[in-house]
């Protein structure tokens, strides 16, 4: 293992539990490189939920919190409000983020709280056996849709934009350097940032890892700054980067206003 990664990992916890060829390692390495580009580890907190992606906090040698299913953003919100000077990064799977955690996701977007959400989207529930998820493509066969999925899937990037996130990007596991840059930009951005990483599951989707990466390379195209109505499921890029008032700042302004009023009453 390269020293540039080992210094940021709990090496005693390795090897990971991830299946051979799982793209989660690509995302993990991209995050480490993003942090090395300009952030202090001691001022960065990493939060995760439940699922294959949730194990990322087990391997990172940061201050980490491994939370309950769908509630990673709720925990992260509390951390950020208590310690707004910290960089808070949240790793979630697609099921964790937009199924059981869907309400937390859209309200974090709406509030525009200064968090970075990295959503690893493999289009199914991997840890529990390959079941149907809200992101499973229409027609896809899973353990719980053996004849094909009849539901329309969520487009996570479009959902984030529509709900109010101020930075939204999407890339695939085939573009680790683009993932790195997007996470770096998201951590720099002052507001709620969503970086969706489209991956896949070699085990449950029964695809060779090399073929999965080839699929991601050949079927996705980069289109930056595309309007919400024009974004397609196979588009990747930075779709939104907008300066908006941040939630913690609004809370602090309110707190100061209330304290000022209380002081007047006590005169």
Swiss-Prot record:
A GO term for molecular function: thiamine pyrophosphate binding
Assembly notes: Heterotetramer of the KorA, KorB, KorC and KorD subunits.
PANTHER family for this protein: 2-OXOGLUTARATE OXIDOREDUCTASE SUBUNIT KORB-RELATED (PTHR48084), 2-OXOGLUTARATE SYNTHASE SUBUNIT KORB (PTHR48084:SF1)
Keywords: Oxidoreductase
Reaction catalyzed: 2 oxidized [2Fe-2S]-[ferredoxin] + 2-oxoglutarate + CoA = succinyl-CoA + 2 reduced [2Fe-2S]-[ferredoxin] + CO2 + H(+)
InterPro entries for the chain: 2-oxoacid:Fd_oxidoreductase (IPR051457), THDP-binding (IPR029061), TPP_enzyme_TPP-bd (IPR011766)
Cross-referenced Gene3D superfamilies: 3.40.50.970
EC number: 1.2.7.3
Claim: Mitochondrion is one of the keywords in the record: no
GO biological process assignments: organic acid metabolic process; sulfur compound biosynthetic process
Source species, domain of life: Archaea
Protein name: 2-oxoglutarate synthase subunit KorB
């Amino acid at each position: 293992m390269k020293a540039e990664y080992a210094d940021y990992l709990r090496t005693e916890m390795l090897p990971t539990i991830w299946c051979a060829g799982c793209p989660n390692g690509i995302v993990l390495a991209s995050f480490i490189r993003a942090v090395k580009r300009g952030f202090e580890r001691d001022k960065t907190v990493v939060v995760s939920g439940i699922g294959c992606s949730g194990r990322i906090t087990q391997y990172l040698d940061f201050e980490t919190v491994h939370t309950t299913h769908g509630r990673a953003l709720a925990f992260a919100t509390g951390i950020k409000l208590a310690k707004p000077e910290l960089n808070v990064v949240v790793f979630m799977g697609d099921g964790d983020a937009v199924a059981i955690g869907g309400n937390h996701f859209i309200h974090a977007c709406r509030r525009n709280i200064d968090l970075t959400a990295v959503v690893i989207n493999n289009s199914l529930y991997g840890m529990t056996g390959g079941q149907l998820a809200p992101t499973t493509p229409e027609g896809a066969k899973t353990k719980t849709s053996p004849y094909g999925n009849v539901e329309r899937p969520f487009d996570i990037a479009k959902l984030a934009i529509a709900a109010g996130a101020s930075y939204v990007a999407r890339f695939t596991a085939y573009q680790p350097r683009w993932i790195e840059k997007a996470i770096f930009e998201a951590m720099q951005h002052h507001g709620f940032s969503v970086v969706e990483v489209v991956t896949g599951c070699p085990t449950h989707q029964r695809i060779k890892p090399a073929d999965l990466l080839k699929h991601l390379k050949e079927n996705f195209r980069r289109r930056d700054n595309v309007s919400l109505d024009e974004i397609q499921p196979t588009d990747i890029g930075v779709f939104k980067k907008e300066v908006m008032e941040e939630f913690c700042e609004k809370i602090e302004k309110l707190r100061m206003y209330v304290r000022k009023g209380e002081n007047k009453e006590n005169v």
